[in-house]
Amino acid sequence: MENLRQYKADTEHKKVYAWFDNSEKNPASRAQHITSLPDSIDIVGLMYPSELATFEKEEIVTLRQKGTKVAYAINYDEIKTQYEDLISTQPELENESTFDTFLKKEIEKQLAYSEPFDGIILKFIGQNPKYMTVEDKAAYTASQNIFFNTTLDWINKNEGKFLSLQGKPQNVVDKNILSKFLHFIIEMYQVTDKNKFPLAIQDYLETGVPTDRFIMAVSTPSLDASDTSTGYIGKERAIIETAYWITADAQEYDKCGIAINNIQNDYYQTNGNYHNVKETINIMNPAPSK
């Protein structure tokens, strides 16, 4: 256990984030437990943080003893869509609640889930502010400030917890706040050719965006047999191809690790539970040869 904690504390190793679907509150198999995940995962993101079952809270403590952190997401774009859907069905609400009021209330509601967790991953795509009118940019900046300042206020009051950002840091107007994030998780779900990885990252190399903390997000294959594209780059598994790419040095930015979406899909493998995830980790962080 101590060796495991030391390994996690080592800043040099490539980090592994794992998004886990914890919607099942009466688990019928080991696949539905976060304690079944490979020990060398650094950060587990739970997709459903609001009503944790007792067994989940206990398992978070078990993971913490292994040096694994557990987090959840607050998603700016989802909150915006939620507000727009509400206004489209009940237009009279627009007079009572602006988006900014709705946003602040929703963030505060979701921050209340944070007590058992070690950190929060802010999901933010937003829009490119370069092409906005002065009025639109002012409104966009005000909404952003609410989203980020509310969570930064939370982190300042919760020593030892962390914030990461998943999405597009280049669309953040006030780039000064970006230094507060542990990692930027860059979504590579749409990449279909491993040679296009460097191209996909070019958009992120913008003045003011720290380039020393990039994590690449890809998915495991879907459990739906008819879906042959999710989790694949060409014919190969995306997590494996991405791991190999992460091990190759880049001049302009640091590849700090991988984020695996829907990690639980890799549990049942003929050659052992989480076989592909373990291979991914081993490619990035090979066990020292004896």
Where are these regions (language model features)?
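Bacterial Sec-dependent N-terminal signal peptides
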Residues: 1-12
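Generic detector of well-ordered alpha-helical segments enriched in charged/polar residues
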Residues: 5, 100, 104, 275-282
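Generic recognition of flexible, low-complexity loop/linker segments
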Residues: 5, 32-33, 246
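Chitinase-like catalytic core of GlcNAc-active glycosidases
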Residues: 11-202, 211-220, 224-227, 271
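A conserved mid-domain beta-alpha-beta active-site/ligand-binding segment of alpha/beta enzyme cores
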Residues: 205-207
